[in-house]
């Protein structure tokens, strides 16, 4: 995340709440989303270097600098592309957008599920890191967000594969992915950070380039929502993520209801999933739908990858805390200061948000 926020905010008091995720009936047999997460989430999103040998870890590969055009950047690009092409069994269409600007080589990565959908929900984060300070790996900025999106893609692929079984084919009205007119795009932006000093020509390189392409080819008119994640996963007392735009406050309220389900649901539905339940029990609220401070402004208070899409009329849901965590743009933005539970919490929220968004189009 590049630009500083505009308005100083006070830290809101936080409560630590309880417990578990909702079980959904999606077919003739119960596919428990909570059970899927209990089986896969901890291994997929774990910053502990002891998990280095796990090929299923989606977070640790980001524990490196990812300056545009560098070998670290190329390695993480290969990792992301391989995740979609191989690990996810080719369910997603993979596009790259390579270009040069200001003396640097950039490459956006765009992944699409349901390539022929009439509209798209776009999930996005940037994968690059700042040039200075030297050695900054950008754990919250934005390795954690990228890992959450990779996990969301894995989760959606799991659902899509099951929907091709006979049980799902016999109960089409209960499908989530297959019959939705809403597709999903996951975008990994390059070049969000400034090369020298943040400004309109030295920032959000990838977002500006992709927005121009989507305006030219008509894709922009098919984007129902851009859901952008940034600066998530801090281990400190992270401030709340406010609702920034009146146009998407309804989507923000949906995300808030999902978080309430996650935090308030009691343990009688756990059925032995104690490890995940204990982790959820330590979580707190991140959203406050009664905070209307920004809804009447009619403009952004934060410069980020969403701005060219917002200017083009795309509704934006921006998940970024304000004020920013204290490790922002310092060498302390590393994996020692990254909170795995916070990162997993956001992965769960995004997964359920996408499922409910797709389901709403099937009704």
Swiss-Prot record:
Q: Does the keyword Transferase apply?
A: yes
Going by the UniProt record, its keywords in alphabetical order are: Acyltransferase, Transferase
**Keyword field contains Acyltransferase:** yes
Signal peptide limits:
none
Q: Which residues form a coiled coil?
A: none
Its domain of life? Eukaryota
Q: GO terms for CC?
A: endoplasmic reticulum
One Pfam family matching this protein: Peptidase_M28
What does the record give under GO molecular function?
glutaminyl-peptide cyclotransferase activity; zinc ion binding
Instruction: Give additional notes from the record.
Output: Present with 3970 molecules/cell in log phase SD medium.
Q: Extract the PANTHER family matched here.
A: GLUTAMINYL-PEPTIDE CYCLOTRANSFERASE, GLUTAMINYL-PEPTIDE CYCLOTRANSFERASE-RELATED
Q: What is this protein called?
A: Uncharacterized protein YFR018C
